[in-house]
């Protein structure tokens, strides 16, 4: 693929992440379940808020994987990041579809989330592959924790959302393990704490906006 073709492909990914229209290569989990099964207004609103948070997380994931893939020194790491990024695109499409089914919308702050995450990913990439992969692993670990907490509060009747979140959780675990196996280092505790604080701001805002 030429440099121009790569640029067009990456720009298309960025546009689909921010504006919408992501395509999934895998079927949407829970697609055989009833879309709004016995959800009252409050339950649907809560489910939509959580799925919006998850959608923002996938917007950020696209930015992180794109920027870190651009700066990866090792071609094998680039391939690994590309594979994980494609599965994250599935997640993005699933969340987007579920938000539409719930009569809601993605976060209005998606351009901000994408730009900020892209910049952070560039910084991680500049630090070198081992630190960049460590950042991926820690990010996926925190996302896994968020998804587990969502499974605890999503309405039991919302089988479609729950199926999506559970499959995302499984994928995130695999992505984090792949990053560590590829040579990622465990990030220092202060860095983990800063990442957790930033994540808290993002999830709180995305739930509402």
UniProtKB/Swiss-Prot annotation:
Its cofactor is Fe cation. It is found in: Cell membrane. It holds the Pfam family COQ7. Signal peptide: none annotated. It is a peripheral membrane protein. The keyword DNA damage does not apply. Its EC number is 1.14.99.60. The keyword ATP-binding does not apply. CDD domains: DMQH. GO terms for cellular component: plasma membrane. Its main location: membrane. Fe cation 1 binds at residues 58, 88, 91, 172. Pathway: Cofactor biosynthesis; ubiquinone biosynthesis. It comes from the Bacteria. It catalyses: a 5-methoxy-2-methyl-3-(all-trans-polyprenyl)benzene-1,4-diol + AH2 + O2 = a 3-demethylubiquinol + A + H2O. InterPro entries: COQ7_proteobact, Ferritin-like, Ferritin-like_SF, Ubq_synth_Coq7. GO terms for molecular function: 3-demethoxyubiquinol 3-hydroxylase activity; metal ion binding. PANTHER family: 5-DEMETHOXYUBIQUINONE HYDROXYLASE, MITOCHONDRIAL (PTHR11237:SF4), COENZYME Q10 BIOSYNTHESIS PROTEIN 7 (PTHR11237). This is 3-demethoxyubiquinol 3-hydroxylase. It comes from Polynucleobacter asymbioticus (strain DSM 18221 / CIP 109841 / QLW-P1DMWA-1) (Polynucleobacter necessarius subsp. asymbioticus). The lineage of its organism: Bacteria, Pseudomonadati, Pseudomonadota, Betaproteobacteria, Burkholderiales.
